[in-house]
């Protein structure tokens, strides 16, 4: 499958700068997906335009690539993944997911990270454009999700997901996936 993983821009209130550091989580998930045979493109919206800043709503600073530049950078993908680590960033990440949905209405949009893991039903309710939330450590769960999507399997067989099901959009969740115990088997990050 063709996959794009997106690290959104960093945001701050201006009182303190955003942490513009390499984002390991999405790099590890990208590496796991590549090792499983998927074509993965990682877009680090902070790292790919680190000097760009934009004032948002008159009080926040966004660091990194603009949404329109992302539209030029993203390639058509079957699955597009996002990360949201911090709850204070969700409102901005939601806007990004909504923007990408307009560009790629047929893609499956997946989100993970600490905020999403903590409030998956809220994320799905607050952002109707989002299809699936990955809960907890994503390396194994995301690869199992891709395998299941590729063979048109049942999402209920993949532990660690919350998703909408059926025409009514009922939320379904699967049992939480176990923690990764053998961390030496995780592939090195895909930079």
Regions found by a protein language model. Give the residues of each.
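Glycine-rich beta-alpha loop elements in corrinoid/cobalamin-binding modules
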Residues: 2, 32-180
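A short, charged helix-loop
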Residues: 179-191
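Nucleotide-activated donor-dependent transferases that construct or modify glycoconjugates
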Residues: 2-17
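Glycine- and acidic-residue-enriched helix-capping/strand-helix junction motifs
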Residues: 14-26
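Hydrophobic residues in alpha-helical membrane-spanning segments
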Residues: 23, 160, 188-190
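Hydrophobic structural segments
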Residues: 27-31
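Short acidic, gly/pro-rich beta-turn/loop elements at beta-sheet edges
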Residues: 13-15, 90-92, 184
